[in-house]
């Protein structure tokens, strides 16, 4: 049975304007905001994640922001558990949740569920896989995956490091290919919700301009200093999920090397810009695949989205 109140999912690539749109919608009705962003969960990572400021969060409170340290891990399964608990609590108070963000894996997990009995992550198994990658290269790790799970080898590329690690982790723990388990296992889907799905998909040229503006501002307001503070406060390394976030990965690599010349700094900024554009490209791909399965309304401009959502909820 569905709740009478809906769950609004507002998705879009990075820098598309979705957060500002959600905040405007928040002002117009009986809503609460839930962040769907794998980087915003981390404390002390503010500038590089374009996290709403304290003042903005006081005006527009977001759930699932600043909930763990950069040393901790937050999974899609944990997100679904936390989000469902928040949705139920909001509905009990007569509020309509707005889930806003760009982590499409989280949205997919919420909309479609997760395989119910895949094993949890095992730090020791992961460390062994990463050690093999460091010693022998990712091609050797990928070849191992192809040998034990050919179907996963077809789905993944050598560059899909996290997916390869997870697939091998599942195999080493269970002795079975992850693709076989995923095909066989039932999924826990929160059918009790009525999802209203909206996506901002701006023109890519315009989006790239917005990304450049965001990164330029990020450097200007002290992003490198933020990462330096993180290095001083936490025992960071590049394999932590938090440090795989775009911008942070490139800044950490730059700051941990001895050559911090202007040339290397510019190279780092260029790498961060390229990585952010690639992230947006992947987010577009995820959104298109979700649209093939679920009902969506898509908008090419923020103006178009504002007008339609005002009519629907304002």
Swiss-Prot record:
One of its GO terms (molecular function) is ATP binding. It holds the Pfam family IPPT. InterPro entries: Dimethylallyltransferase, IPT, P-loop_NTPase. Keywords: ATP-binding, Magnesium, Nucleotide-binding, Transferase, tRNA processing. The record marks 103, 126 as: Interaction with substrate tRNA. Substrate binds at residues 14-19. SUPFAM superfamilies: P-loop containing nucleoside triphosphate hydrolases (SSF52540). Residues 37-40, 162-166 are annotated as: Interaction with substrate tRNA. One of its GO terms (biological process) is tRNA modification. NCBIfam families: miaA. Monomer. Belongs to the IPP transferase family. This is tRNA dimethylallyltransferase.
């Amino acid at each position: 049975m569905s709740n009478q109140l809906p769950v609004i999912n507002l998705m879009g690539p990075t820098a598309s304007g979705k957060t500002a749109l959600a905040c405007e919608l928040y002002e117009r009705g009986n809503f609460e905001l839930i962040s769907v962003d794998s980087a915003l969960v981390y404390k002390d990572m503010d500038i590089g994640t374009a996290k709403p400021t304290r003042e903005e969060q006081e005006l527009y409170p977001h759930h699932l922001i600043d909930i763990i340290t950069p040393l901790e891990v937050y999974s899609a399964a944990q997100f679904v558990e936390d989000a469902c608990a928040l949705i139920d609590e909001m509905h009990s108070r007569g509020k309509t949740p707005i889930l806003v963000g760009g982590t499409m894996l989280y949205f997919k997990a919420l909309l479609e569920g997760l395989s119910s009995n895949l094993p949890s992550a095992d730090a020791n198994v992961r460390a062994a896989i990463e050690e093999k990658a460091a010693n022998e290269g990712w091609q050797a790790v990928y070849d191992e995956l192809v040998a034990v799970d050919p179907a996963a080898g077809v789905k993944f590329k050598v560059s899909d490091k996290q997916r390869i690690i997870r697939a091998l982790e599942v195999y080493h723990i269970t002795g079975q290919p992850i693709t076989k388990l995923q095909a066989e296992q039932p999924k826990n889907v929160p059918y009790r919700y009525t999802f209203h799905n909206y996506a901002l998909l701006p023109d890519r040229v315009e989006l790239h301009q917005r990304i450049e503006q965001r990164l330029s501002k990020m450097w200007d307001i002290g992003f490198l200093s933020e990462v330096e503070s993180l290095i001083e406060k936490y025992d960071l390394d590049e394999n932590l999920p938090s440090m795989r976030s775009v911008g942070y990965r490139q800044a950490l690599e730059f700051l941990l090397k001895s050559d911090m010349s202007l040339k290397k700094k510019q190279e780092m900024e260029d790498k961060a810009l390229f990585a952010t554009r690639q992230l947006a490209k992947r987010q577009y791909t995820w959104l298109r695949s979700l649209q093939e399965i679920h009902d969506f309304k898509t908008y090419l401009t923020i103006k178009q989205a504002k007008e339609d959502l005002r009519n629907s909820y304002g």
